[in-house]
Amino acid sequence: MFPDHLSDLFSIPQLFGYVAFAFGVGCFLQKSDLRFKIYMAIECVAYVVHFWLLGVPTAAASSAVSLGRSLASIRSRSPWVAAFFIGLAIVMGVWLYKGPLSLLPIMASCIGTTALFFFSGIRMRLLMLVGTGLWVVNNILSGSYGGTALELVILTTNCWTIWRLRRDSVSTLT
């Protein structure tokens, strides 16, 4: 996981990881579901490039599917569209399978798709938290410095935003 040389921290693949980091944190700070999905789409673009350059094709493919599903979920809540993205993630996972590590991004993608199409607000973010845990493990094992940092910060940021949404909903009831 740790770089052999300091220059590895500033390599092209890692720079894309840091861009994903910035947009990922911005994503999970959003209380608006629409802004959440837009930031997530931009994060996914950076992740596709990051993982492709790191040589982790299942994570790159999963991020590409996540990009498509993030954009689609802005316009649609259709179970058929969700099923398409879940099926696509599974097909890509089978096609690019290289071992157990390959399953983590695919599972995270399926969970994220379910969250984005079938839930909103706190429930959507709670399910995204499960996917975040899978990405933490994937990124550690893949050697993604920016990705690991991102997911750990997202874990914290998402919990904080869930707390803020919960606090806001309680204050509107009183």
Regions found by a protein language model. Give the residues of each.
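Alpha-helical membrane-protein topology signature
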Residues: 1-174
